């Protein structure tokens, strides 16, 4: 591109102003002479700082162009996948779309967990600020704060009715809350270190918890007594999750393993060992996903004749793995995140996996084709947790940036 005489003159004056104002006197004199510039103080005022302004605006434009190119590529990809001409898309294929519907502020420290209520249009979040907050996700309104823990609240879990909420904390306790009266009805002591994870069993009679003390404990809801302790992990147990019928309990740990336990006998049914770093998160695949999983992994699954249940794990090695618990085999490894994977779940429709990570993204995976089909830049800092509503078209994410975001799916 050739500059006109006027543009050339303006550029030369802007360069001269930059050299002079930054103290490059010798270069300024030489340049002024070479460019045959007649510097006029009044005239040159309008060129003050012009070069820096142009430079920053070029960078800004480049960034915008890159963003637009990325969106264009996403759109092309979706068209290739038969994507979202999707006002008519089947709810089983709803996926979160940017931008977020709400970005909710209120926590004063990183958000550690986000979960939807199983019945009402509310969600609950926990934070390192030692509080639990309740929000209306449809209206984007804050409703109330539950206080009681004296240190970071690490995890929260509803029972299937949504009447009880369990929470656990770095204060080494587990609390049970009446979610109708928003009161703490029981505090359980027994772990010797930070309690990192909690889950109410599907029957609602027991709670399981995992701790940095390397143990998993089972507690009776009615009495608050510890009735079982599961030992075997060699390091901090990061997360614990029961399967759909409560017969199995999965756990993951800093020892880089995932273990599956028989709930009644405490027997370790499987020890899954292929991750190369701390395993941060786990999630059971719902029954609705089994046909797609079997189709996607037919060769691996059919070798043994029996298959399932299936478990997902996410690790600091940046990968997500899918396991067949009947055989202990890793069926697939999904690679794409650029940092620690912090949350993972199977889409309620059974066809996709949704994950979040310290690379600040939310990703949707078409696991049948073992590829990431959509990446959302979700937060300005690490994304610590996500949840997807079982029936309504919403995903929620929480972050170290102290915000909670609600994403609409379509």
Curated annotation (Swiss-Prot):
Q: Does the keyword Cytoplasm apply?
A: yes
- Top-level division of the source organism's lineage: Eukaryota
Keywords assigned by UniProt, alphabetized: Cell cycle, Cell division, Coiled coil, Cytoplasm, Cytoskeleton, Developmental protein, Differentiation, Microtubule, Mitosis, Neurogenesis, Repeat, Transport, WD repeat
| Residue stretches of each WD repeat | 106-147, 148-187, 190-229, 232-271, 274-333, 336-375, 378-410
Q: Name one GO molecular function term.
A: protein heterodimerization activity
One GO cellular component assignment for this chain's record is: centrosome
Please list the residue ranges annotated as the LisH domain. Answer: 7-39
GO terms, biological process: cell differentiation; cell division; establishment of mitotic spindle orientation; microtubule sliding; nervous system development; reelin-mediated signaling pathway
The record's listing under Pfam families reads:
LisH_PAC1, WD40
| Written domain comment of the UniProt record | Dimerization mediated by the LisH domain may be required to activate dynein.
Subunit structure comment from the entry: Can self-associate. Component of the cytosolic PAF-AH (I) heterotetrameric enzyme, which is composed of PAFAH1B1 (beta), PAFAH1B2 (alpha2) and PAFAH1B3 (alpha1) subunits. The catalytic activity of the enzyme resides in the alpha1 (PAFAH1B3) and alpha2 (PAFAH1B2) subunits, whereas the beta subunit (PAFAH1B1) has regulatory activity. Trimer formation is not essential for the catalytic activity. Interacts with dynein, dynactin, nde1 and ndel1.
Q: What does this protein do?
A: Regulatory subunit (beta subunit) of the cytosolic type I platelet-activating factor (PAF) acetylhydrolase (PAF-AH (I)), an enzyme that catalyzes the hydrolyze of the acetyl group at the sn-2 position of PAF and its analogs and participates in PAF inactivation. Regulates the PAF-AH (I) activity in a catalytic dimer composition-dependent manner. Positively regulates the activity of the minus-end directed microtubule motor protein dynein. May enhance dynein-mediated microtubule sliding by targeting dynein to the microtubule plus end.
- Family listed: Belongs to the WD repeat LIS1/nudF family.
- Protein name (database record): Lissencephaly-1 homolog B
The organism of origin for this protein: Salmo salar (Atlantic salmon)
């Amino acid at each position: 591109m050739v500059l006109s005489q006027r543009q050339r003159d303006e550029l030369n004056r802007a360069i001269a102003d930059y050299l002079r104002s930054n103290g490059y006197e010798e270069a300024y004199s030489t340049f002024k002479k070479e460019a045959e510039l007649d510097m006029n103080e009044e005239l040159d005022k309008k060129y003050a700082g012009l070069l820096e302004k142009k430079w920053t605006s070029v960078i800004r434009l480049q960034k915008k162009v890159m963003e637009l190119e990325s969106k264009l590529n996403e759109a092309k990809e979706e068209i290739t996948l038969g994507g979202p001409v999707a006002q008519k898309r089947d709810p089983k294929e709803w996926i979160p779309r940017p931008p977020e519907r709400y970005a909710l502020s209120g926590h004063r420290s990183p958000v550690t967990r986000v979960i939807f209520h199983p019945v009402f249009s509310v969600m609950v979040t926990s934070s390192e600020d030692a509080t639990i907050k309740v929000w209306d996700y449809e209206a984007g309104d804050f409703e109330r704060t539950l206080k009681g823990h004296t240190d970071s609240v690490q995890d929260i879990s509803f029972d299937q009715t949504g009447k009880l909420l369990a929470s656990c904390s770095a204060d080494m306790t587990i609390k049970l809350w009446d979610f109708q009266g928003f009161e703490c009805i029981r505090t359980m002591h027994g772990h010797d270190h930070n309690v990192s994870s909690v889950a109410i069993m599907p029957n609602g009679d027991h709670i399981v918890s995992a701790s940095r003390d390397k143990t998993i404990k089972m507690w009776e809801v009615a009495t608050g007594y510890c009735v079982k302790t599961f030992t075997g992990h060699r390091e901090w147990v990061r997360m614990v999750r029961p399967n759909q019928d409560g017969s199995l309990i999965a756990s993951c740990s800093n020892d880089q393993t995932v273990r599956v336990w028989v709930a009644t006998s405490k027997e370790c049914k499987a020890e899954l060992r292929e991750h190369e770093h701390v395993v941060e998160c786990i999630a059971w695949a719902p029954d609705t996903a089994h046909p797609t999983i079997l189709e996607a992994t037919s060769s691996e699954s059919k070798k043994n004749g029996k298959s399932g249940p299936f478990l997902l794990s996410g690790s600091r090695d940046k990968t997500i793995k899918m396991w067949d618990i009947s055989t202990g085999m890793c069926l697939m490894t999904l690679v794409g995140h650029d940092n620690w994977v912090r949350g993972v779940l199977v889409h309620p429709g059974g066809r996709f996996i949704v994950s979040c990570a310290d690379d600040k993204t939310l990703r949707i995976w078409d696991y049948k084709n073992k590829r990431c089909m959509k990446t959302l830049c979700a937060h300005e800092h690490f994304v610590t947790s996500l949840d997807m509503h079982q029936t309504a078209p919403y995903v929620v994410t929480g972050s170290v940036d102290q915000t909670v975001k609600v994403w609409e799916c379509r």
